[in-house]
Amino acid sequence: MNRITSLFGIKYPVIQGGMVWCSGWRLASAVSNAGGLGLLSAGSMHPETLREHIRKCRAATHHSFGVNIPLMYPQIEEIMQIVVDEGVRIVFTSAGNPTTWTAWLKQHGITVVHVVSSSRFAMKAEAAGVDAIVAEGFEAGGHNGREETTTLCLIPAVRAVTSLPLIAAGGIATGEAILAMRALGADGVQVGTRFALTEESSASEVFKEYCLHLKEGDTRLLLKKLSPVRLARGNFQQAVAAAEAAGATEEDLRILLSRGRAKRGIFEGDLEEGELEIGQVSALLNEKGIQTVAEVMDELVTGYQQACETLAANVCERWDV
């Protein structure tokens, strides 16, 4: 066991990202049943829908699971009360100030993890009293940090300023990547894109198949005047890029985003007008196809073990100094 498996009561230090329109009870329970930590995404659920998913997830697994809550959620008070009322034991917070809710959640016996994109925000999260930190790099899909720091650079930077349990996120889809993050100082990893494209994900099959054919360079980080989002190539990505190049104001960009674009793209599979949020690592998955969560977890665990053995046998030679 390590600090992440001990903190959450799980077998493997692998957390499934709480992704809008992907992370419902089927995905979260499947990840938890496979030995990781499944997360429900409150960001794309009405409060009572979240309550329903919490109950269905609990019925589908006797293992630990949690809820990811964007702190900018418009009905945040109602969402927070629901997770307390439903007995949720683990909450990941993101997109907001962790000082607002951390103490209240911990008073109710909830383990709190906050997602950051820089060492500066990591220090603020630790000061707020969180139990662990997710450091998410530039490679990640969906909402991202303004710093544009890659995971390779971010993890050691965050490790240098905090002793809290640290979870690496962004661009992680293989066992080898997990080992790399461990070498950089992370105690565990959060995997988004790989789980978003599984059978149990609530994303549209059209969206999944589209993302499994993306190539390097097919995703871009846009909407930096608002909240940076990594988007896959398509009409909406082109429209946003053109608007930004033409000097669009924040209000102009909000109008572009105001028609439920993420739901249309991810959940409904509208490749023409929808917002297609996915990570850079999708380009490594072209040969995978849509897999089950169990298959993905087995590949991650086996790949990690094999990478450890390969390094021990062939790579980690001593250098004369």
Segments (PLM) and residue ranges:
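Active-site entrance/lid segments in N-terminal catalytic domains of soluble metabolic enzymes
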Residues: M1-V161, P165, V315
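Residue-level detector of alpha-helix initiation sites
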Residues: C22, I172-A173
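Conserved active-site-proximal phosphate/metal-binding subdomains
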Residues: G145-I167, A173-V321
